[in-house]
A protein has these predicted regions:
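CheY-like receiver
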Residues: 26, 113, 162-166
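Short glycine-rich anion-binding loops that position phosphate/pyrophosphate groups of nucleotides
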Residues: 43-45, 107, 131, 178-181
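A short helix-loop-beta submotif of the ANL/AMP-binding
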Residues: 140-146
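Conserved PLP-anchoring active-site segment centered on the Schiff-base-forming lysine
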Residues: 116-138
Length: 187
């Protein structure tokens, strides 16, 4: 019996993930030419001095013997509690430990949240420059990304007129879907 050839979903037609695609290929070429490349594309924060809080490290050690099975679907309680405490230190109101969900990295959580929040043809306003996974996740969830400008000359703050020009009936709602994650951390 001959197996049917698998073909990729049309959902991938407009998905480009530059972190592992053309930008990475160009960076490798530059590296081969002798350029020094700092690799920030895969998300290994430890390589750049960002370490897990000691409370989380100790909780992982303490729970290692329980790690052979599934955890609570929201993640281990202790790290969720630590995250809740962090939000309290930052004066972020009304965050309870049950509001915190931990995943296997930001990629999983971005895709999961877009699938949970978007209906087909919902438009999502995304800052430009952006973390490419936002655009890919919106597209895979059936939404349509609309990029608004964050200009270096303006200290990377969003261009409010550009945002206003991008508001349409597809993204105008009681809760406008606006992604404010910005690699420049100006927010």
């Amino acid at each position: 019996m001959k197996l049917a050839q698998l073909k990729k979903s049309s959902k991938l037609n407009n998905v480009c993930y530059d972190i592992r695609g053309p930008v990475l290929a160009h960076a490798k070429k530059m590296e081969e030419e002798g350029h020094r490349i700092i690799k920030l594309n895969i998300g290994n924060p430890a390589a750049f001095g960002f370490e897990a809080p000691e409370e989380i490290v100790q909780d992982v050690i303490r729970n290692m013997s329980k790690a052979s099975g599934y955890t609570d679907s929201k993640g281990l309680f202790e790290p969720r509690k630590s995250i809740m405490h962090y939000t309290q230190e930052k004066n972020i109101p009304n965050v309870d430990v049950d509001d915190v969900i931990i995943g296997n990295g930001v990629s999983e959580l971005i895709v999961m949240s877009m699938q949970a929040l978007l209906d087909n043809d919902d438009e999502v306003l995304i800052p430009m420059p952006d973390y490419p996974l936002w655009t890919a996740a919106v597209t895979l969830a059936g939404g349509r990304p609309r990029h608004y400008l964050c200009d270096e000359v303006s200290n990377w703050y969003p261009d409010l007129k550009d945002i206003e020009s991008k508001i349409t009936e597809q993204n105008k709602s009681d809760c406008c879907k606006l992604i404010q994650i910005n690699p420049t951390r100006c927010f």
